[in-house]
Amino acid sequence: MVGFTPVALAALAATGALAFPAGNATELEKRQTTPNSEGWHDGYYYSWWSDGGAQATYTNLEGGTYEISWGDGGNLVGGKGWNPGLNARAIHFEGVYQPNGNSYLAVYGWTRNPLVEYYIVENFGTYDPSSGATDLGTVECDGSIYRLGKTTRVNAPSIDGTQTFDQYWSVRQDKRTSGTVQTGCHFDAWARAGLNVNGDHYYQIVATEGYFSSGYARITVADVG
């Protein structure tokens, strides 16, 4: 994701299914994209962002479940989880993930002080994001090898508007669509690699991201300790 600027849409969040009003046919024909929003739904924090370039629909379902379908074009990311995040959390996820092209399924979040966007990538489409990052080695977590990396975004959108910030990556080489992520293993590995992991957490979600691709995902998340 290039970043997220929060949009408070509490009334939409309460309904669970976020979409344009039925009477707004012109806008539906133009974008057919769920409006950007974030907030609480059925005990979980969700975030949904799109640059408007793709035909995309995000829907909050019961509990920790969400659904996304998207078409070619643009950048989008959404999912459910918690706010605030934690360095050490056991996150179980499972469901359906069917990308066509460049896409990630990841534990995803932000910290402030420093401002950092981080990804623990469990599955991806045609592009391994660690291949474009500064190589920080590997770590074994949750039964697989993850490639560690760092990138820097300059004057890019973020949770605090346009900023320059680092992105931390931990990318699983044995892809999976279900399992449990021990986030502490990854934060510890980043710290050993010299990265600052002492920031103040904002949200921490299991997100599906698409970048000029298409696909479908229906994911359920839970905190299991």
From Swiss-Prot:
EC number: 3.2.1.8
Record pathway: Glycan degradation; xylan degradation
Gene Ontology MF annotations: endo-1,4-beta-xylanase activity
Keyword Nucleus: no
Keyword Metal-binding carried by entry: no
UniProt xrefs under Gene3D superfamilies: 2.60.120.180
Main EC class the enzyme belongs to: hydrolase
Active site: 117 (nucleophile), 209 (proton donor)
GO process terms (BP): xylan catabolic process
Cited InterPro entries: ConA-like_dom_sf, GH11/12, GH11_AS_1, GH11_AS_2, GH11_dom, Glyco_hydro_11
Span of the signal peptide: 1-31
Temperature dependence: Optimum temperature is 60 degrees Celsius. Thermostable.
Domain GH11: 32-222
Annotated family: Belongs to the glycosyl hydrolase 11 (cellulase G) family.
Name this polypeptide is given: Endo-1,4-beta-xylanase
Species: Thermomyces lanuginosus (Humicola lanuginosa)
Name of the gene encoding the protein in the UniProt record: XYNA
